[in-house]
Amino acid sequence: MQKSMYDLTTPQKLIWYTEEVYKGTPIENITGTVTIPEKVDFTLLEKAINVFVERNDSFRLKFSTRNNQIKQYIEDFSSFYVDIVDINSDKELKEFEEKVVTTVFDVFNSFLYNFIMFRFPDGHGGFIINMHHLISDAWSAGLGASEIIKIYTRLIKNEHIDDITYPTYIDYINSEQEYFQSEKFNKDKSFWNSLFKSVPDVSTIPSSIDNKSNLPCCSNRVQFTMPNKVLNEINNLCKSNRFSIFNFFMSVFAIYIGKVSRLDEFVVGTPVLNRCNIKEKHTSGMFVSTVPLKMELGGNIQFAELASTVSSKFFNIFKHQKYPYLSLLKDLRSKDKSIPNLYNILISYQNIRSTAQVSETPYEINWVPNKYIADNIDIHIYDMNDTGNINIAYDYQTSRYSKQDIIDIHNRILNIINQVLQNVNIGINDVEIVTHKEKDKILHNFNNTKLDYPKDKTIVELFEEQVQKTPNNIAVVFGTEKLTYKELNEKANSLANYLKNKGVVIDDVIGIFLDKSLESIIAILSILKCGATYLPIDINYPNTRIDFMLKDSKCKFILSSANLKDKLKKHHNVIFIDLSNDTLYTYSKNNLNITMSDDPCAYIMYTSGSTGNPKGVMVSNKNVVRLVKNTNFIEFKENERILQTGSIVFDACTFEIWGALLNGFELYIIKKQDLLDPVLLEKYLVDNKITILWLTAPLFNQLCESNPSMFKSVRVLLTGGDVLSPRHINSVKKACPNLTIINGYGPTENTTFSTCFTIDKFYDNSIPIGYPIANSTCYVVSPTLNLLPVGVPGELLVGGDRS
């Protein structure tokens, strides 16, 4: 007789899609161990299992294709043997469970369940049930366990079991088809489409893992039991404020997810029973569906208000839970095809065994995770055995998270809970997610960067000390021109004395309008020797920008050259000084020994600004000295040769120029045409034995594309100014295994580098910006300036030496 064929229900379709994506894995297995803590009659237990399967048609569902469509039918019952295995210890049982749960079902034309009984030496034992999600959900699994125990109990007592019957899953299949044609369906559709008129960004919980090389759906579980004291306080809080345990935990997790995702609005998936009446609650089969819960955290609402809002949202969602999530996605994608899955974090609350308290035969259910999940992280809040204890289990993709990540997440959740218990009306913005231990680590370990350096000396003092130490060593090289430390000092002194005679006084601002050259270095030193501040101006800046910078900084003089004078004609109020005039260098060559303020401004550098006009950043002598003297981000060796790659208008030159001249090294200034040509640059690096250079990330990428091995002769390469490309970094690391590559990050306001990271391995996704450099601080904070944990993205607060 031909079997009646049925369409898959919507919950089954969702399972089928997941099965197709992760074919050959046990991702849709539901496995539970039912243990009876007394001597078991395994013959009667086997019979009870048979009776249950015979009277529940959902267990006998089989699946096949008809005209390229997946269909299901009910197979006739025939009694079956249930294997029994002897187990000697709980450890051995756990190992056996792991073996059972990873068994992959053949979903076509075969039964999608498997029962195995187990027996301990003292005669107690139970059974393991492994089912495919196509024929069952967690509610059905719990229902099945309790009903099998119920039948077993009657058999033990020699009572009749003829009156034990169960509703058919076919009724649900038919009722769903009726629902699709009903007015209720249209109302539900309208509700969900209205709710998601705007689709929030997908939230995510950051992790420490960069190299996501494992199969994406492989997972592990970490499980915690809430401390009794804390749980009692939570129960009391929920009762007095009239919200449920689940709403409490959902609100706590929402705060955490929102803060680490930097989202005020996002979606969390949460499973619902999708059983709309008593009959369906007593029917085995796949009913459960996942609904998207839209969380809104804006406006610094209080926790009590959030929990109340979540409660109201759930109330409305439950009224419309029958509308399929797949249908909602289809609706949304009909308007915007780019809409992804609405969530990748799932939070569930389960208290399945409501019938356990009335069972005459004691038993306990232990659910076994199958170690595969489709979402990034599934969070289960549950009390499976009605113990009154709340457990939180985190199933997490091992390609994304480490076990320590999950432990850290849970500790932060406990921290949020403690704050809420102290003040249920705490504002969301005031909730801190970092634990006390994490805060201590960030404040006193991560930011313990204090190192001794000559902070009470100016750039000029340190440079002149270096001149005394190595007067005849080469200081700076440009093309075929070079100057020793003594020659550079004397030229700078002559120019400084000239400037002093022209009326330059301490704290004046002096512009430098020069291309890269020896003269630019002489100019910088001469201005500093006057106790003045230098203002670098790019020769290619438009007149409007130059005019703004000169007026904004109150610049009085510009050091330049005759060939550039025409570009400055309109700036009449500024005195032009031509450095190509040899008479400027006939003044005294002696040090000026000018007494300066405690920490004079060294230079003003204009950045693009955020208001349309450039923004002038004043950088003190102390900031420069902190950057290059006795620092921790780079180890200087003897006889370094540092390449100046950028114009003096970019703050990387602060490291290049003063990293060389305040440490007795040689500064090499490269011409632009040589820098941008990979062949010429490689030749320059080799011929001049350059040991250290800085490149902006875009230029580094461009050069790498041409020849990743061009840096073989270099000892240290610093790069940054933009997000680094792992592909290009990895390429150079492979080609130049002896090269040290440092990711240098920092705003101009904090003097070139705030953080640095020595790239010691290959990265697939993002490269860290590292740690604060010596005598600096670095804090990652939320938009409301709450401290964030290490590894969580946020706003970066940086600071220098406050001593």
Language model segments and positions:
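Motif- and composition-driven signal specific to adenylation
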Residues: 335, 518-526, 530-551, 563, ...
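Carrier-protein-dependent adenylate-forming modules in NRPS/ANL systems
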Residues: 1-167, 206-207, 232, 242, ...
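Short, highly charged C-terminal tails/helix-capping segments
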Residues: 429-441
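Adenylate-forming
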Residues: 3, 13-22, 31-39, 49-51, ...
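Short functional linear motifs
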Residues: 13, 42, 141, 189, ...
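Generic preference for hydrophobic
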Residues: 72, 84, 115, 268, ...
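Short acidic/polar active-site loop segments enriched in Thr and Asp
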Residues: 244, 264-266, 505, 556, ...
